[in-house]
């Protein structure tokens, strides 16, 4: 999924729009009721993720179950959360079609984990 595809999917599933709190390319996905983040799309240098080559890539940070994070991090395209709590968040490389299903599942889980306690 590209960042735009993530935004479109979240709009269809949750009725949320990306927000740009830092007036740059990085976008936050948040609940409309409690304002909690369930996703963060950032552009980061490849070297910050241990990837070869020059330039930057888009990643998606989502909240997840710590048990799942350990399992996902053994797979290509998943990383310790960049600029987030590494125990509860994971970074996923975007623009890798083979990760699309996992991205949707993890976005859904992140949305659920950050939902207001009243709604659970």
Question: Over which residues does each language-model region extend?
Answer:
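Charge-dense, helix-prone N-terminal extensions
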Residues: 1-120
